From Swiss-Prot:
It catalyses: 2-C-methyl-D-erythritol 4-phosphate + CTP + H(+) = 4-CDP-2-C-methyl-D-erythritol + diphosphate. GO terms for biological process: isopentenyl diphosphate biosynthetic process, methylerythritol 4-phosphate pathway. Belongs to the IspD/TarI cytidylyltransferase family. IspD subfamily. InterPro entries: IspD, IspD/TarI, IspD/TarI_cytidylyltransf_bact, ISPD_synthase_CS, Nucleotide-diphossugar_trans. Pfam families: IspD (PF01128). The lineage of its organism: Bacteria, Pseudomonadati, Pseudomonadota, Gammaproteobacteria, Pasteurellales. Keywords: Isoprene biosynthesis, Nucleotidyltransferase, Transferase. Catalyzes the formation of 4-diphosphocytidyl-2-C-methyl-D-erythritol from CTP and 2-C-methyl-D-erythritol 4-phosphate (MEP). The record marks 20, 27 as: Transition state stabilizer. This is 2-C-methyl-D-erythritol 4-phosphate cytidylyltransferase. Pathway: Isoprenoid biosynthesis; isopentenyl diphosphate biosynthesis via DXP pathway; isopentenyl diphosphate from 1-deoxy-D-xylulose 5-phosphate: step 2/6. SUPFAM superfamilies: Nucleotide-diphospho-sugar transferases. The record marks 155, 211 as: Positions MEP for the nucleophilic attack.
Length: 228
């Protein structure tokens, strides 16, 4: 199957609470420029023609979801999220019915994604898959439990992982299964694929594809979105 004929599915884990935001609701439902973060994110994916379906994994009895008109788009399928991000992604993968599908896993709170970056990911064809990432630009320190510097890392080989992360759906499903069986802490999909023996490609992304994690990130995301 060529890259032009393979089904492309997006999985968006959106069941988290975002405790570091110190907000009165999960961060994906915070509002920027009249829309929630989740709406901004979904609209980018919906408007990208190669994506055939978006699987949205949300918390059970989510009280905010039905307030969003965008979730009624026919491309969007809702599934129940898991206990953590990896569990939500796993549930999303289980809902994929298309054979030979490739999956783009994207954070609900990364609203500034561009189609140009998605185009670059779609160039990947081998089973290693790949992720958007940016080279580390700040000096990186390794710390002790007491928050004292142990050493300075060589940043020339360090990259900061972003999303989407793009893999064959069946391979990612098996990689997550294997990671769960071994009790691996899966912080992103690439870590599960690495554990399974793959070497995902690093695709240079953009610094404005930020994940809204802390209160100060909201203003920065608003600035980037206002310039689109």
């Amino acid at each position: 199957m060529t890259r032009h004929s393979r089904p492309i599915i997006a999985v968006v884990p959106a069941a988290g609470v975002g405790s570091r935001m110190q907000a009165d609701k999960p961060k994906q439902y915070l509002t920027l420029l009249g829309k929630t973060l989740l709406e901004h994110t979904l609209e980018v994916l919906l408007s990208y023609t190669p994506i055939q379906q978006i699987i949205l994994a949300v918390a059970e009895n989510d009280p905010y979801l039905d307030q969003l008109d965008v979730i009624r788009q026919p491309k969007i399928k809702i599934v129940q999220g898991g206990r953590d991000r990896a569990g939500s992604v796993f549930n999303g993968l289980k809902a994929i019915t298309q054979p030979h599908a490739w999956v783009m896993v994207h954070d609900a709170a990364r609203p500034c994604l561009t189609h140009e970056d998605l185009d670059k990911l779609l160039q990947i064809e081998d089973d290693n898959g790949g992720i958007l990432a940016i080279p580390a630009v700040d000096t990186i320190k390794r710390a002790s439990a007491e928050k004292q510097i142990i050493q300075t890392e060589d940043r020339s080989q360090l990259w900061q992982a972003q999303t989407p992360q793009f893999f064959r759906a069946d391979l990612l499903y098996r990689a997550l299964q294997q990671a769960f069986e071994h009790g691996l802490a899966v912080t992103d999909e690439a870590s599960a694929m690495e554990f399974a023996g793959f070497r995902p490609h690093l695709v240079a992304g953009r610094s404005d594809n930020l994940k809204v994690t802390r209160p100060e990130d909201l203003k920065l995301a608003e600035f980037y979105l206002s310039r689109k």
